[in-house]
Amino acid sequence: MKKILLTILIIITILSINVMAVDIDIGEPAINRGSTASTYTWVNIGNPANGSGTITSIEIWASTALTNCEVATFYVVSGNNLSTRDSELIGSVIANSKQTFAVNLDVQAGDYIGAYYTVGALERDSSGFVGCWMNTVDRIPCTNVLFTLRDGEAISLYGIGTTGEEEAINSLFFGTNF
C-alpha cells in the first residue's frame, strides 16, 4: 500500500510541474557599440521576433542618458512602411551599461523592436548588421508610416518574452490553466 501511495505521489508531483514557456527574442544585443543613435525613432531589422506572445523584458544600452524613452513592437505594412503593434514608456535610461526593464508588449512572429527618446543617444553600429529603420520624429505609436532604411546598422535594443504556450500545455494535461 505504501508503494502505491508513493507512486501516486510521484506521478502527481511530476504532472504538477509547471511547463516552461517557450522564449521569444527580438532585436540586437544591448552592448557597447562603435557609434551612437540620436533622438529619432529607431527600429532594429536584425533578429525579428521568433514567436508570438508577450515581450516581458527589454535590454537597452545608452551611450548618453535617455529621457522619455518609449519602446514598441513594429510590423511591416509594405516596403519601408511600418506600424506599431504595442508600445510602453520606460522613462529614463542611465548611460554606459546594459539596463533591463520589465515590460508587457504584444508581439507577433516577424515583428521588430524599436525605440524613441527625447534626450540622449543609444549605442549604434553603422555597419556589419542587417540594418535599421529610422524616422526623424516620434513614431511611437504610428500607423503605416514611411521609415528610412539604414543598411548595415544596429542599435543596442533587445527583448525577450514568452509565447504563452505553457498555459495551453498545462490545460491539456490538467484541464485548467496554471
Protein language model features and the residues they cover:
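Short proline/glycine- and polar residue-rich coil/turn motifs
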Residues: 90-97
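Positively charged n-region of N-terminal signal peptides that target proteins for export
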Residues: 1-4
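Short alpha-helix capping/helix-loop boundary micro-motifs
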Residues: 99-101
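Bacterial N-terminal signal peptides
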Residues: 7-16
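Viral virion structural and adsorption modules
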Residues: 167-178
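Beta-sheet-rich sandwich/jelly-roll-like modules and their strand-loop junctions
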Residues: 20-87, 103-112, 116-167
